[in-house]
């Protein structure tokens, strides 16, 4: 799962900015249903707390595509969650096929946030309950899902090979793997306090989509 992901709707403190008002008028949407995106809102983000960790839904999209297009997901051996910076959890149905286009993905997530305010779910052509969004902390998600281990992948963790990590994962009854869904920094205490262990698969910092792809591939190899 991606944790503290840089995926959120426009924070309330930005709504009154002229540039934001123009942007949401152009999109004809409520600001609470528009994704914060540094590509469009850089100037307005300068005064935000933790601005360097926020407003990168494209990074989340890349990582989700790496997970969604895998045999591990196709065979229902992988459950995808995204925990966001502002404590929402997005759960993806096993039948979902995420769009390759970022703009289509952003529109889908914006629609999901809009529907979640009415406690509804998005329905697809061939599936229902494809995306579910709820207000939930990482701690609450761990309590709800009751994983046997929670492994955080971070450069602060013990350096091990991909094959060693995959063996740790497949030897656990119900493992959860946490990957940082932000462009800079490390897990905050609201994540690290609930990790069973911290591991690193490379001496250098890697993008979330690279970590996701390599980890899933190593697990698939170990399961053969």
Segments from the language model and where they lie:
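RNA substrate-binding interface of SAM-dependent RNA methyltransferases
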Residues: 1-157, 220-221
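Eukaryotic short linear interaction motifs
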Residues: 9-10, 89-90, 159-161, 185-187, ...
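Short coil/turn segments at secondary-structure boundaries
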Residues: 13-15, 164-165, 190-193
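Structural signal for hydrophobic/aromatic residues that build the beta-strand cores
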Residues: 64, 153, 177-178, 198
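Long, charge-patterned amphipathic alpha-helical coiled-coil/hairpin "stalk" segments used as oligomerization
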Residues: 134, 154-163, 172-186
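Short, well-ordered alpha-helix to beta-strand connector turns
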Residues: 147-148, 173, 195-196
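RNase H-like, Mg2+-dependent phosphodiesterase core
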Residues: 166-170, 210
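Structured adenosyl-cofactor binding patch, chiefly the S-adenosyl-L-methionine
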Residues: 183-224
């Amino acid at each position: 799962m991606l944790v503290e992901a840089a995926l959120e709707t426009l924070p309330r403190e930005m709504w009154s900015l002229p540039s934001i008002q123009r942007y949401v008028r152009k999109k004809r949407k409520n600001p609470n249903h528009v994704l914060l995106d540094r590509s469009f809102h850089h100037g307005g983000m300068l005064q935000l707390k933790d601005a360097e960790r926020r407003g990168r839904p494209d990074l989340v999209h890349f990582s989700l595509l790496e997970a969604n297009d895998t045999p591990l997901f196709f065979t229902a051996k992988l459950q995808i969650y995204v925990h966001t910076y502002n404590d929402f959890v997005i759960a993806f149905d096993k039948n979902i096929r995420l769009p390759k286009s970022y703009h289509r993905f952003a529109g889908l997530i914006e629609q999901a946030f809009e529907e979640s305010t009415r406690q509804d779910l998005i329905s697809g052509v061939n599936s229902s309950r494809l995306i579910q969004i709820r207000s939930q902390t990482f701690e609450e998600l761990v309590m709800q899902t009751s994983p046997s281990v929670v492994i955080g992948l971070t450069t602060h963790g013990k350096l091990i090979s991909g094959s060693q990590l995959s063996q740790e994962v497949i030897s656990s009854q119900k493992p959860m793997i946490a990957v940082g869904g932000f462009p800079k920094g490390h897990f905050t205490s609201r994540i690290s306090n609930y990790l069973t262990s911290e591991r690193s698969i490379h001496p250098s910092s890697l993008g979330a989509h690279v970590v996701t792809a390599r980890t899933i591939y190593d697990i698939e190899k170990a399961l053969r």
